[in-house]
Structures are given as structure tokens and as C-alpha cells.
């Protein structure tokens, strides 16, 4: 455990600080860090050592969850660059995206009211495709250092993930 708890998540796993992550390398590095900090290795250690090992394990878990999920990784990367996504406070979106949001919400509501699982499935496919395309665009924005636009893209992706989740739940409810 030569690294320090204050190290950024990328440094913890020895990865380059970038949006694109080699998932196999991340998984391998995570297993290495976890094995070094596993509580069983410190069962006979003193309280202070066990506490530090638990902090390391918790830090590694949080780092792994963050870097494994593209949207969380992008938000974290922007934070490292001094950019606060402000998802709670900054809801400014382009008029085109606002219109798209309304269309998706309306399609969701109508399909639920009509119990049209096939339309919900189609909406879910559309949302997942939109999400894939936007993640690719987000990667390009981050790689280009366009942090402001990347922050806007993150906020849009948060909305898309929310409606994707709502659509998935609606399908589950209707299929029960």
C-alpha cells in the first residue's frame, strides 16, 4: 500500500488520467489493491493498522466504482480539472435537447398509460443508442479539453440515464 489515500483514483490504479479506460487493466489493478488492503491480511494487526486497511479498501472500492462507470468517470475527471458539473444547480440545456427531453417523457407517459410494452422497448433501445453516441462525443470533448461542453454533455447524459431507468422500471412494472 505504497500509494496514499489522497492520490487521485487514476493514480491509485496506475492508470493515465483520461476518459478512456482500459477496463481489463482497471480490473487487474483493483484486485491488486484490494488484495493488499483486504481485512483478512490485517486480522492480527493492531487497531490502527486494521482501520487504515479498512480505509484503503473503502477508498479502492469508491475509486473502482467511479472509474468503472463512464458517467461517474467523466464527472470525476472534470472535478480533477476544477470543473463542477453542478447537475443539481445547472439545468441549462439547449432548446433542441429540451425538446427531445419532452418528447421522450411524453412517449414514456403515453406508453405507460396505454400499457404498450413494445413502445417502451423501442424507447429503451432509442435511449441506449443515444447514450452510446453521447458517450463517444463526451470522450472527444474531454480528450480535446473542452471542459465546459463536456460538463453540459454530462448533465445531458444524466438526464438520459434517468429516463432510461424510468423506462426500464415501467417495463418491469407492466410485465409483472
Curated annotation (Swiss-Prot):
Keywords, sorted A to Z: Chaperone
GO cellular component, one term: iron-sulfur cluster transfer complex
InterPro entries: DnaJ_domain (IPR001623), HscB (IPR004640), HscB_C_sf (IPR036386), HscB_oligo_C (IPR009073), J_dom_sf (IPR036869)
SUPFAM superfamilies: Chaperone J-domain, HSC20 (HSCB), C-terminal oligomerisation domain
SMART domains: DnaJ (SM00271)
Molecular function in Gene Ontology: ATPase activator activity; protein-folding chaperone binding
Domain J, first and last residues per copy: 8-80
Statement: the UniProt record of this protein carries the keyword Magnesium: no
Keyword Chaperone: yes
Assembly information from the UniProt record: Interacts with HscA and stimulates its ATPase activity.
Cross-referenced HAMAP family: HscB
Job description of the protein: Co-chaperone involved in the maturation of iron-sulfur cluster-containing proteins. Seems to help targeting proteins to be folded toward HscA.
PANTHER family linked: IRON-SULFUR CLUSTER CO-CHAPERONE PROTEIN HSCB
Protein name (record): Co-chaperone protein HscB homolog
Gene encoding the protein: hscB
Amino acid at each position: 500500500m505504497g500509494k496514499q489515500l489522497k492520490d487521485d483514483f487514476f493514480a491509485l490504479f496506475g492508470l493515465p488520467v483520461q476518459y478512456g479506460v482500459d477496463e481489463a487493466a482497471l480490473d487487474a489493478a483493483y484486485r491488486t489493491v484490494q488484495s493488499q488492503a483486504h481485512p483478512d491480511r490485517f486480522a492480527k494487526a493492531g487497531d490502527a493498522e486494521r482501520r487504515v486497511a479498512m480505509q484503503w479498501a473503502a477508498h479502492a472500492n469508491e475509486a473502482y466504482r467511479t472509474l468503472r462507470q463512464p458517467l461517474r468517470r467523466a464527472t470525476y475527471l472534470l472535478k480533477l480539472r476544477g470543473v463542477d458539473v453542478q447537475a443539481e444547480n445547472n439545468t441549462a440545456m439547449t432548446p433542441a435537447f429540451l425538446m427531445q427531453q419532452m418528447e421522450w417523457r411524453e412517449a414514456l407517459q403515453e406508453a405507460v398509460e396505454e400499457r404498450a410494452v413494445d413502445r417502451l422497448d423501442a424507447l429503451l433501445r432509442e435511449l441506449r443508442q443515444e447514450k452510446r453516441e453521447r458517450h463517444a462525443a463526451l470522450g472527444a470533448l474531454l480528450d480535446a479539453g473542452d471542459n465546459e461542453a463536456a460538463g453540459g454533455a454530462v448533465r445531458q447524459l444524466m438526464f438520459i440515464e434517468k429516463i432510461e431507468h424510468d423506462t426500464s422500471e415501467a417495463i418491469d412494472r407492466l410485465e409483472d
